[in-house]
Structure formats: structure tokens, C-alpha cells
Regions:
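Short hydrophobic core segments
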Residues: 31-33, 71-73, 96, 177-190, ...
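Flavin (primarily FAD) binding-site architecture
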Residues: 185-201, 312-323
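Short gly/ser/thr-rich secondary-structure transition/capping motifs
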Residues: 12-18, 167-168, 202-209, 288-293
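Rossmann-like dinucleotide/flavin-binding elements
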Residues: 22-94, 209-253, 318-321
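A Rossmann-like FAD-binding core segment of flavoenzymes
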Residues: 1-2, 113-114, 119-120, 133-173, ...
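FAD-binding beta-loop-beta segment adjacent to the flavin cofactor pocket
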Residues: 6-32
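Active-site-adjacent segment of FAD-dependent monooxygenases/related oxidoreductases
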Residues: 98-136
Length: 333
């Protein structure tokens, strides 16, 4: 069997990856990166990187006159694993997560999506053996791990800046400031959701992730985006009773999606389970309708909910301000 290689970016479309040493340290001494932000999207590998990074930090010595040995930013697989390892290593840690739940990118997977298919080793827990495990089961397991171990997570706390502080750092968030010897960045590449910047977007009917398709039963829903997450959201909604689904995408084709998703959308469109508007953009969001600009001209759609799946704004500018160097990978391992 041929070996599997991890490839970053494509030949034409590069991806910015932080410059990180084999010990997960950036060019800024004391700031580490593990998991998806560093290019590792596999759950098992991300969790392993989180554990290994904490081991490096443990060997470096104590916090000195700082409040924490390490501030861990992001509670996806890498951050969760790092937090457990910090407890096991008796480090003074602070784990923060900008959203209101753990799981990182996994939390944003569609319902019942297979999330992990390989064993993973977690500090305090040991080796966890899964066959194919769905998103919901994996998140429930992680919740159980948090309760069992007493892992402390600061939810809805978003990193806004990192300033040098003697031989350590001050991590500034929307909740305050944390003095720490080291910083471990384990947030994903989603960043904050990319917004449409159109009138009416601030209304409650606009969301940036699909959590439970059943809550939209019987509604007219607009899904905006052309990636796998947008297509999977539209397909999940189209399965619900009485739901009227329109998928709006600004380009002329779904060129960057999995073949199975493209085929499923084409089939659903043929069966009239959903409507696809390519080369369209949202102009305005109103209480009971949305205004689109389409290749055929202006269009008004009946609407009770808008789900924007337009990706995220990467944290690259913030990290560059901290001093972290990036390199653009084009289809390279």
C-alpha cells in the first residue's frame, strides 16, 4: 500500500503556514503552535501535537513570576489534549476558547459526519480506541472527559493581542489579561466567520453555522457559500420536511468541493429538493425575504433564515503582529 502524504495547499492556491520548529515553537521564543493552525487537520495528529508541545514546555521550567506556565488558545483536539497534558504535568495553565463550546472545527461538522477513525492518546485518559466515530459521539466523549478530569475552559474568551512581558507574555482577551511564561496557540484556521457585509445581516435569523437542521423544518432557508460546508448544510436542510432551500454562490461552479458533494447537489437540484443560484450575491436581508443579485437580474426570495458558510477570516494578521513568520506552501508536504 502506498504511503499517505500530507500536502499543504495546491499548485495554484497556496496556504499560509506558520514557521514552526520540530518542537512546535515559532520564531518567537515561548510561543508554540499545534494542530490545525500549523497545518495539521487530522484529529489524532492534532491531539498528539498538543500533548507533545506541553511536554516541551514542561521541560523548559516553571512560570517564574508569571501567573501561568502556559496560556492555551483554542479548545479543539489540540487544545483539549494540551489542557489535559498540562494538568498531568502539574503546570499552571489557562485554556481559553472563543466559542461557547469545545471541539473547534469538529463542532462545525454537519450532523452525523464521521469525525475520527483512528485511536488517540490523551493525558489522564490513556489510549482511546474508536472505530468510525460520528461528530456527536466524539463531542459527547470530550464533554465527558472535561467533567471527569476537571479541565477548566474559559468559553467565549477571544485572544485580542499578545504582548512581550519580560521573559514571558501578556495575553490580552475580551475578558482581561493573563501573564504567562509560554503561549500555545491551538486555534483552528477558521478564525472568525467571514460576513457578507450587507444590510440586515445583524438580524437574529442570520447564523454562520448549521447546528441542527430540524430547527428549520418548514422554513425558507438561504445557504450562502460554495465550499463543502455550504453544500453539506444545504443537503442536510433539503432532507427536512417542508424546508425550502436555496443555495447561493458567487462563482459559476462549485470547483473546490468533494466530488460526492457536487454530485449530491446536482441530484438534489434535479429532484427539486433545493434550488441553486450560481453567480449570485446577497444584496440585502429583510425580515421575510432576501434580495439577491443574479446573472438573470435582481431576485427576491421568501426567507425565514440565512446560513452563511463563507469560511473564516484567518488569524494571520494578529499572529504577524505578534511577530510570527509565515510561509506560503503550494502543494508541498
Amino acid at each position: 500500500m502506498d504511503a499517505i502524504s500530507l500536502v499543504f495547499g495546491t499548485e495554484k492556491r497556496g496556504i499560509d503556514i506558520p514557521d514552526v520548529s520540530p518542537e512546535f515553537e515559532t520564531n518567537v521564543p515561548g510561543i508554540f503552535i499545534a494542530g490545525e493552525l500549523g497545518g495539521m487537520g487530522l484529529i489524532r495528529k492534532a491531539a498528539e501535537q498538543g500533548r507533545q508541545a506541553i511536554e516541551v514546555i514542561r521541560k523548559r521550567g516553571g512560570a517564574g513570576d508569571h501567573d501561568h506556565d502556559v496560556v492555551i488558545v483554542g479548545c479543539g483536539p489540540a487544545g483539549l489534549s494540551a489542557g489535559l497534558s498540562a494538568i498531568e504535568s502539574k503546570l499552571r495553565y489557562k485554556l481559553i476558547e472563543q466559542e461557547d463550546s469545545l471541539g473547534g472545527a469538529v463542532f462545525h461538522y454537519p450532523r452525523n459526519k464521521i469525525a475520527m477513525t483512528a485511536p488517540v492518546k490523551l493525558a489522564l485518559i490513556g489510549k482511546v480506541r474508536f472505530g468510525e466515530v460520528q461528530k456527536e459521539k466524539l463531542l459527547a466523549f470530550w464533554d465527558q472527559v472535561v467533567r471527569k478530569t476537571g479541565l477548566q475552559i474559559g468559553f467565549r474568551e477571544c485572544m485580542q493581542a499578545v504582548d512581550k512581558d519580560g521573559d514571558g507574555f501578556i495575553v490580552r482577551t475580551n475578558r482581561g489579561a493573563h501573564r504567562t511564561r509560554n503561549v500555545l496557540l491551538t486555534m483552528g484556521r477558521r478564525g472568525t466567520p467571514r460576513k457578507l457585509e450587507v444590510p440586515g445581516e445583524e438580524t437574529p435569523k442570520v447564523v454562520y453555522r448549521l447546528i441542527d437542521p430540524a430547527q428549520y423544518d418548514g422554513q425558507a432557508v438561504l445557504v450562502v457559500g460554495g465550499g463543502d460546508s455550504a453544500l453539506e448544510a444545504a443537503l442536510a436542510l433539503a432532507e427536512r420536511p417542508g424546508t425550502e432551500v436555496t443555495l447561493s454562490y458567487r462563482s459559476e461552479a462549485f470547483s473546490r468541493v468533494k466530488q460526492k458533494n457536487r454530485q449530491a447537489i446536482e441530484e438534489a437540484q434535479r429532484d427539486r429538493r433545493l434550488r441553486v443560484e450560481l453567480e449570485s450575491t446577497v444584496v440585502a436581508i429583510e425580515p421575510e425575504q432576501v434580495q439577491l443579485k443574479t446573472k438573470a437580474g435582481p431576485a427576491t426570495l421568501r426567507n425565514q433564515a440565512v446560513i452563511v458558510c463563507a469560511g473564516g477570516l484567518l488569524p494571520t494578521p494578529l499572529l504577524q503582529k505578534i511577530g510570527i513568520r509565515f510561509e506560503t506552501k503550494h502543494g508541498t508536504a
